[in-house]
């Protein structure tokens, strides 16, 4: 189970092994542990040789491995960095494994299997003594296995943190390589810029004799000679601007139009329209009906102000006509119902003759012969005459008096007309 969790090798994780250069063989004592002097010496040598095994970012964590020797309780073990914590956990697990042989009921079998001596774990490592266990004297294998599982879980967490640190170091190295490549590309670009600058300097030096001479300014002596001096010192290209030419061309094309067959010297155009649609034509188009359609675009105040009101006011509603005046104009078999107004549907009598087969709206209507229609009498003509209220009498046009003033001013022209005099008065 432990082999599946620990992916990296102990050397990469910073854990010292038997073949590492930092291994020191301490002087064993009667109890099998190194003395205090040898322990401090081995710790000092391990801290000095640790930078050769670990990256620069883990040197500080490796230097704190000596702090694990001062841990007096297993509760403080979680406060250590990942590397010293993993080392302390491995030492505790080694102690538990050694005690497992002592507590096992098959101790004699293990001794015979290992040829009279039980194996020792991490005995040759120059590591400080491990912190005390939660249960320093377990009495059964079950207690040892429960403590071993707890230590194994903590070891997995420490290894996970170490793996994250290694991933961050790999990412840091990758970023460093990218920065180095970018620096090399920037350096190459700077070299190209320097070469281009050198070439441009050479070109400027070569063509320094071919500079354009400055134009001499013409002083203006009098206001009368201003136009002549400006026309002699400037050209057409300096007088005209492209923006003005385009604006004038747009103005001509918008307001001037002639049919293709029009020739010079012909009569003036009548009814010709400019090529661009005018305002009234745009308002009569189908697109103008969708001007106020909400299509999801925000409506600004400027768009509301740009709305043009209708140039032609709608005609007033027609005045109510006197229906009694047209009663005598209708045939006797057609009766006008009460409340009927012009524009409402008309119900024709049933006795009207049907149109011939194949007749369509717009075809001529065959009327009955004139002999069958009785001519109305003169009294009927007078009675059928519409009332005078239906026709509006023509308005009286009043022309203002025109004063010609022929003899008052001698400087006036010899010829005058009514139109000219009326224009002057206006």
From Swiss-Prot:
Comp. bias regions, Low complexity: 36-56
Keyword Signal attached: no
A Pfam short name: Med4
InterPro entries in alphabetical order: Mediator_Med4
Annotated GO MF terms: transcription coregulator activity
A single BP term in Gene Ontology: regulation of transcription by RNA polymerase II
Coiled-coil stretches noted in the UniProt entry, renumbered to this chain: 160-212
Amino acid composition bias (Acidic residues), ranges on this chain: 406-426
Keywords carried by this UniProt record: Coiled coil, Nucleus, Transcription, Transcription regulation
Ranges annotated as biased composition (Polar residues): 19-28
Main localization, broad class: nucleus
Domain of life: Eukaryota
Entry's localization field: Nucleus
Any single GO CC term annotated in Swiss-Prot or TrEMBL for this entry: mediator complex
Residues covered by region (Disordered): 1-56, 214-236, 373-426
Role, per record: Component of the Mediator complex, a coactivator involved in the regulated transcription of nearly all RNA polymerase II-dependent genes. Mediator functions as a bridge to convey information from gene-specific regulatory proteins to the basal RNA polymerase II transcription machinery. The Mediator complex, having a compact conformation in its free form, is recruited to promoters by direct interactions with regulatory proteins and serves for the assembly of a functional preinitiation complex with RNA polymerase II and the general transcription factors.
Record family assignment: Belongs to the Mediator complex subunit 4 family.
Self-association state and partner proteins as the record states: Component of the Mediator complex.
Name of the protein described by the UniProt record: Mediator of RNA polymerase II transcription subunit 4
Organism name: Arabidopsis thaliana (Mouse-ear cress)
